Amino acid sequence: MGVSLAILHYHLRTGGVTTVIRNALTAQYDRNAAVVLSGPATDLAKLLDAYGAKDLIAHKVKVLSMAAGAFPDGPPEPNIRANIAAARRVFAEWPTPIVAAGYEIGTALPFPAASIEQDFAWSATHPIADAYRAYRPMPYDAPTWAMAALLYAVRPKENYFRLSEPGTVTVLDDGRTQFRASAEGMHRYLILDPDRKESIIRTYTEIASAKPVERKKKLAAK
């Protein structure tokens, strides 16, 4: 979310990323918004500082799905390591349920190189394929941390993933995440069901490479 909103802010010259997020949430029905974080938690931590933001989040957001951490344990994950203080604050103060797509999920569900090289050929340029090619020379299968967080957020009832028991995620000083189960906890993390692995990767490729649907032009007013 941080990267995409920063780009949106640059092009639209809005008052700032925090303003963009607040305006987007204000326009939503109560408990209707799903927030997806695919990078460092910097912008969401700044949002928590804004006047009335926590109440707004609590009323508008049903879940924060974030590509962050490593579960049940593991080394510091890059998104958290990029801004440890911001990640710690979001996990500690965000007022709605949080679901984390950990490092282990992204590495277990690689986006196929064959899809990157073939399925986007309908367009001379495509932001997804171009980004993968720019990151490193093809072919390579790309980890999908952000895609996992997004897929859970937009299709939670499809049961692509299992969820951990409720608990609390704490960000340690070195960037590692510690999960402690508790009935009153508001945090969970995604767990991969091996039987769903192929269907998840297939869903990734189908959605990511789909051609945009043309909008029908409105009839001119008589």
Per-segment meaning from a language model:
Residues M1-K222:
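N-terminal acidic, glycine/proline-rich low-complexity segments
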